[in-house]
Amino acid sequence: MTGNIGRPGTGANSVTGQCNAMGSRLFANASGLLGGRDFLNAGHRAEVSRLLHIAPEKIPAKNSLAYDQILQGVADGKIKGLWVIATNTAHSWVDSARANGSLDQLEFLVVQDMYATTDTAQRAHLFLPAAGWGEKEGTFINSERRFGHIKKVSRAPGHAMSDFNSFRLIANYWGCGEVFSQWTSPQ
């Protein structure tokens, strides 16, 4: 718009309201497949399967729902349970009244967060305490789309654990732990 792209001290930055929102877009925790790939494209699914060491048949051949579609699914009674990870949907969603109404309709809400005091966590039927940034190893992507490495510098309090460990434990409990069998760290 101003003609300053590519000049020193300038650039296009994603201004978002959530921590690591850029990472969530790049690594597809919403409606797309890893790295901007498409669930509907067999070649993309094969590529992601190879990169992540996951059997191709474990990757869905249809798109998942975007955030607004998830909330609509809850409002329509099609979605009965939700697992919310590291975000406060009740407070930060564009239409918080709609988000709160949808969250209140759920039969089962799981919230995995480092704060049990958020509006969303207060509604949870099950709260999974999560480790904070200095209590786990990991990566993040900043608004300049640069990757950063987070080193663990202290132990998480109480029963809190890294998201990665929570995912692995729940996957094992659900009987699909083999999907994570080759993954030994979140990197």
Feature names for model-found ranges:
Residues M1-G11, V15-Q187:
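Non-catalytic alpha/beta scaffold blocks inside enzyme catalytic domains
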